[in-house]
């Protein structure tokens, strides 16, 4: 798929007060949507404080073995996972955010059944960071390249929360709206020509794994920090494992949040159980406790 025209559609937005149906409708039509005021900025500030305390231990640039040529990972970006252990607010608030789950239910329930996390990740674009090459997140799973994007079920939904303001000049996520139904191929475009998801703290960008996108170049003098929460059908193996989370922490989480991090049985649309233990439900077999929502 060669991207030639610079007359790209705008990234449409709704206010969270308009409801998840309004956001889902645009997501279906464009492959991406900005939802304004979807979460209290104070919640994001608490997560940001937790992240900043350990940011100096995070990976700078690409990890060994990563296919860096696909998305142009470089030494001016910091990637950080392990958010379940890093932030109680992330565990309690973000993993249970009602608006997010309303959208995810609409996307996955009919075609796939239950969903869980692919990963929760911090992407810190430092000053001087170059733009990523436009790409699709679905390419993480090779089967996606044998599927017709226009008719196949979604394999991933990314919900990105800005931890500080997202602008075109500081590396705000660049997207090509309506690209989610185009053919599978390499993508060629001047990333800087794509529209940027400009957002304030408390907003969120939701886009499908089929939507062509990439991190923008940071030409400002301050970092641009985002938290990406990626969800996928429960029949796909997540990128990030949470087996390192101690049981005593897991048992402080809701059943929904536990399932999101892989500590729970998921059901396909045909109700078959996956991630079971001793042929029993995960919680039953382990006697796993949980917190009431």
UniProtKB/Swiss-Prot annotation:
The gene is andA. PANTHER family: PHYTANOYL-COA DIOXYGENASE FAMILY PROTEIN (AFU_ORTHOLOGUE AFUA_2G03330) (PTHR37563:SF2). Keywords: Dioxygenase, Iron, Metal-binding, Oxidoreductase. It comes from Emericella variicolor (Aspergillus stellatus). GO terms for molecular function: dioxygenase activity; metal ion binding. Dioxygenase; part of the gene cluster that mediates the biosynthesis of anditomin, a fungal meroterpenoid. The first step of the pathway is the synthesis of 3,5-dimethylorsellinic acid (DMOA) by the polyketide synthase andM. DMOA is then converted to the phthalide compound 5,7-dihydroxy-4,6-dimethylphthalide (DHDMP) by the cytochrome P450 monooxygenase andK, which is further prenylated by the prenyltransferase andD to yield farnesyl-DHDMP. Further epoxidation by the FAD-dependent monooxygenase andE leads to epoxyfarnesyl-DHDMP. The lineage of its organism: Eukaryota, Fungi, Dikarya, Ascomycota, Pezizomycotina. Transmembrane segments: none annotated. Fe cation binds at residues 135, 137, 213. This is Dioxygenase andA.
